[in-house]
Amino acid sequence: MDILPAIDLKDGKAVRLSKGLMDSAKIYSDEPWQVALRFEELGSKWVHIVDLNGAFAGKPANLEQIKKIRENCNLKIELGGGIRDEETIKMYLELGVDRLILGSIAVKDPIFVKKMASKYPIAVGIDAMNGMVAVEGWAEVSTMKATDLAREFANAGVQAIICTDISKDGMLCGVNVEFTESIALASSVDTIASGGVKDIQDIINCKANGNISGVIVGKAFYEGTLDLEEAFKIL
C-alpha cells in the first residue's frame, strides 16, 4: 500500500478545503514546492496534486507551481484538476508529471478516458456524495452510482482509481473504508482512498482491509494529527 500526501493548489498556494467548498480554503503554504520537498524528506515516493482552480475552470490554472514542484523534488507526481483533453495530458507528461487523474470527463466521456488510458498513465478520479458521483469540481452531483462508474473502467487499462468520499474530505473524521472497498471490488483496479484521514489508525485500517492500494493524506498532515514519518514505517 502507498501513502500519497496531497497538495491542493489554489491561486498558486497550497490549501485544504472542507467538503470541497472553495470558500472554505485554508492556506498552508505560499510555496507548495517546499511542502513537496518536505514530503520527500519524510519518506514519500508520491505527491498527489490537485489544481483546484483548474478543476473549476476546466483547464490548467497553476502551471508555474507544478513546474516548481517538478524542478525541486524527485517524487512521482500524480495530478488532477481540469484535465479534459489529450493536449493537456501530453503537456503535463512533457512537464514531468507521472500520472494524470481524469475525473469529470470519466463520467461524461468514458470512451475518451479508455482511449487515453491505452496510451498514457491515467488514473480515474471517482468523487462521490452519498454513493453518487459528483462532477465539475464537486459542484454538481450526478445520477450515476460510484460503483457503476468504477465497473465501467474494469479492464480498461487505467493504473488506479482514486476514490473520494466528499462528505469526509477535509473533515478529519476517518476514511470511508467500506466505500473504498466497494469501488475496488467493482473495478478490480488498484483503488486509492481519499477523504477523511485523521490519524495513524486510518492508515492501519486501510492497510488491514487488503483491497485498498493507497491512501491520500491531506489535512491530517497539515494540522498535525498524523505523523507522516510514522505512517510510512507501518506500510
Curated annotation (Swiss-Prot):
Pathway: Amino-acid biosynthesis; L-histidine biosynthesis; L-histidine from 5-phospho-alpha-D-ribose 1-diphosphate: step 4/9. One of its GO terms (molecular function) is 1-(5-phosphoribosyl)-5-[(5-phosphoribosylamino)methylideneamino]imidazole-4-carboxamide isomerase activity. It is found in: Cytoplasm. InterPro entries: Aldolase_TIM (IPR013785), His_biosynth (IPR006062), HisA_bact_arch (IPR006063), Isoase_HisA-like (IPR044524), Isoase_HisA-like_bact (IPR023016), RibuloseP-bd_barrel (IPR011060). GO terms for cellular component: cytoplasm. Its main location: cytoplasm. The keyword Amino-acid biosynthesis applies. Keywords: Amino-acid biosynthesis, Cytoplasm, Histidine biosynthesis, Isomerase. One of its GO terms (biological process) is L-histidine biosynthetic process. SUPFAM superfamilies: Ribulose-phoshate binding barrel. This is 1-(5-phosphoribosyl)-5-[(5-phosphoribosylamino)methylideneamino] imidazole-4-carboxamide isomerase. It comes from Aliarcobacter butzleri (strain RM4018).
